[in-house]
């Protein structure tokens, strides 16, 4: 992270806000960055999403609440929140798509994104769920510090490049 980014973070930034359709290009860029740099962490692939039209990303923004961490240099982190639509599951929501650009890590941006999603959901749902790949110890610690507890282990949840990845299921 260059000095300007570091200064932005230490001076109270980033600004955490819900993304809108006007953020579709920035969202596409950070999403593809995550899929390329950390393919084991996402169910989708870079190859699946790189050729999707911008309208696909706009629609994704409108179908969920996606929080973004904004610095002067642009969008450096995202996390999605999606409430269940089925009547018997409307008391629950799913945290998904968490990603912070490598150069913006270790500055508490992930913590701020999770706090924003949890705060937003608190008046609307009773339970938040998420899945995190077992190897991602940093994310698992972040979620545990935010009050999430492990309740399950999904074996072979994802398969990428011939390798299986297990997920830890967490709830708050």
Give a label for each model feature.
Residues 1-22, 29, 33, 168:
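Conserved N-terminal entry element of GNAT/NAT acetyltransferase domains
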Residues 18-29, 33-103, 114-116, 120:
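Acetyl-CoA-dependent GNAT
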Residues 64-66, 165-169:
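Short hydrophobic/aromatic beta-strand or adjacent loop that forms the aromatic wall/cage
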Residues 74-77, 138, 164:
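Glycine-rich acetyl-CoA-binding "A-motif" of GNAT/NAT acetyltransferases
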Residues 107, 111, 135-153:
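Conserved active-site alpha-helix within GNAT-family acetyltransferase domains
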Residues 121-131:
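Conserved GNAT acetyl-CoA-binding A-motif
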Residues 129-133, 149-165:
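Conserved catalytic-core motifs of GNAT/GCN5-like acyltransferases
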């Amino acid at each position: 992270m260059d000095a300007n980014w570091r200064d932005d973070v230490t001076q109270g930034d980033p600004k955490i806000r819900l993304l809108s359709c006007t953020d579709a290009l920035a969202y596409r860029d950070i999403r593809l960055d995550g899929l390329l740099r950390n393919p084991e962490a996402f169910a989708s692939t870079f190859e699946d999403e790189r050729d999707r039209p911008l309208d696909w990303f706009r629609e994704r923004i409108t179908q969920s609440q996606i929080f973004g961490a904004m610095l002067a240099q642009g969008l450096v982190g995202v996390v999605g929140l999606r409430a269940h639509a089925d009547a018997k599951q409307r008391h629950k929501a799913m945290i998904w798509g968490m990603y912070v650009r490598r150069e913006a890590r270790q500055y508490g941006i992930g913590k701020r994104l999770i706090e924003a999603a949890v705060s937003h959901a608190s008046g609307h749902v009773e339970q938040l769920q998420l899945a995190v790949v077992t190897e991602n110890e940093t994310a698992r610690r972040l979620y545990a510090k935010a009050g999430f507890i492990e309740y399950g282990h999904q074996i072979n949840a994802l398969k990428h490049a011939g390798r299986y990845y297990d997920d830890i299921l967490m709830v708050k």
